[in-house]
Amino acid sequence: MRPLRYSINVTLDGCCDHREGFVDEDLHRHATENLDQADALLFGRVTYEMMEAAWRPPAPTGARPDWMEPFAQAINAAKKYVVSSTLEQVDWNAELVRGDLGKAVQRLKRESGKGLFVGGVKLPQALTELGLIDEYEFVVHPRVAGHGPTLFAGLSTHLDLKLVSRLEFGSGAVAMRYEPRR
């Protein structure tokens, strides 16, 4: 069974608005390594549309630094599954996921391969409620946003996690990986 991994950038006060983190070469390299651990990505509509707008080729010449190219290539090549009840179709190497979320994700996890990687905020919360995420990574940035959406707001019950690794970056960000205590 393929593991389902979740990684998100978050500030010290729990804000998970992508505009509040900061990006550097080390963090992008780490994100690319995360993508390389998965056969496919799982997005909700909002995250899919945001990532497609940011990363789908062609990027205008000089639009981003050269060190972002490995991530751009990895995300463009990746198979994507998009959970949406409103989109009629997707492309960018993507397939719509409809119907019962738990059953659909269990089916994807049963397929052979390296793993699945989920991004965003709302979809991972729903998957957490269903007990389907096998690994959580929080990349905590040394910033207090003071506003914005927070991670797991409204989760119906607490989630106990066990730290399995920690990685510090020169920027002061820390990537902490956890597995659920079951």
Indicate residue ranges for each PLM-predicted region.
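Non-cysteine beta-strand/loop elements that form the S-adenosyl-L-methionine
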Residues: 139
